[in-house]
Design a protein with these regions (language model features):
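Hydrophobic anchor at the beta1->P-loop junction of P-loop NTPases
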Residues: 21
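Short, structured coil segments at secondary-structure junctions
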Residues: 35-37, 52, 181
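Short, well-ordered beta-strand core segments
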Residues: 39-41, 144, 185-187
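Conserved nucleotide-binding/hydrolysis micro-motifs of P-loop NTPases
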Residues: 45-49, 89-90, 150-154, 191-194, ...
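Conserved nucleotide-sensing/catalytic segment adjacent to the nucleotide-binding pocket
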Residues: 49-116
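P-loop NTPase motor core
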Residues: 90-174
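Conserved GTP-binding G-domain of TRAFAC-class P-loop NTPases and closely related GTPase folds
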Residues: 155-253
Length: 303
């Protein structure tokens, strides 16, 4: 057998998908990440205040972020199953500050003599960082989730049509690198539809359920590589189940993940009842486990 043929092999088990979740402020992006399996948030100092039970790392510099990922890579066993970066536009600012410091300027457009060289350096640093996240994912079977804010931008199609659409905040090239890297780009919004008024005077908006879109639309960007439904409820459990199904042990783990996050907002009576339920989850049917998750998720979303 030749040396080249000897290198042919088969792929290993699938790794957790890489997720880029976009949405307006307050839609529930942080809740989505906080209810992922055993998350560690990399976030700003004031991020995640509504989830005191979730572990977080609040860096002051880009060097601290890359240093943390390096230390996590060096661990033989990782306590976290998900790494959540909150948010992409905050991370971009950290990278730009690092580039400006290295270039001896306070303006990214003047870094290294200008002409886009500062942006190019920032993009190259992001590519390297995502590569390190991929190494972490491969070594520890860790899911990587990046959250991002959006804003409305005018878009002109080459064919001549023009319209407004939601786009990731920040530098377009920077966000584009994350989009290409991610397995799933999800857009979170509220599903609103029109219904006729009871008095027949016209139509009114109704609905308002929070959802995630998984496929491209003229009004927003989205994609997935897992053949997901085009629209899902905005919850970690709905996404995980659509992605690969939830095994009973995963349902129990989800309850044990979400419950500590919302326990502090419950009455003493409810806490006592839930504490008792958690003692015998192995004997509970899958349907009842999913109902329990839905109840806990609603409490989390309302906070």
């Amino acid at each position: 057998m030749s040396k080249l043929l000897a290198k042919i092999g088969v792929g290993g088990p699938p790794l957790p998908s890489r997720v880029f979740l976009l949405g307006v402020e307050g839609i529930g992006k942080t809740t989505f990440g906080a209810t992922a399996p055993k998350p560690l948030f990399i976030t700003s100092e004031d991020g995640l205040s509504e989830f005191p039970g979730v572990e977080r790392f609040s860096p002051d510099t880009w060097e601290e972020i890359t240093g943390l990922v390096g230390e996590l890579l060096g661990q033989d066993k990782l306590a976290y199953k998900s790494i959540v970066i909150d948010t992409a536009d905050w991370m971009e600012r950290m990278v730009y500050q690092w580039v400006c410091k290295d270039a001896g300027t306070d303006d990214i457009n003047k870094a290294y003599g200008g002409y886009g060289k500062g942006h190019d350096r920032a993009t190259a640093e992001l590519v390297l960082f995502l590569r390190h996240l991929d190494q972490l994912r491969a070594k520890h079977n860790t899911r990587i989730i990046i959250l991002g804010h959006v804003h409305i931008k005018a878009f002109t199609d080459p064919a001549g049509e023009a319209w407004d659409r939601w786009e990731a905040k920040g530098n377009k090239k920077f966000a584009g690198v994350i989009r290409e890297w991610a397995d799933s780009v999800l857009f979170a919004t509220r599903e609103v539809h029109k219904i006729k008024r009871a008095d027949g005077s016209g139509e009114k908006a109704a609905g308002g359920e929070r959802v995630i879109h998984t496929t491209w639309h003229p009004g927003f960007d989205a994609k997935n590589r897992q053949s997901l439904p085009a629209t899902l409820p905005l919850s970690w459990d709905a996404f995980a189940e659509a992605e690969g199904g939830s095994k009973p042990e995963n349902l129990i783990e989800r309850i044990k993940t979400i419950y500590p996050l919302v326990r502090g907002s419950m009455s003493e009576e409810d806490v006592a009842a839930w504490d008792e339920r958690l003692k015998n989850l192995e004997d509970v049917s899958d349907d009842r486990l999913r109902t329990a998750i839905s109840i806990l998720q609603e409490i989390a979303d309302s906070e």
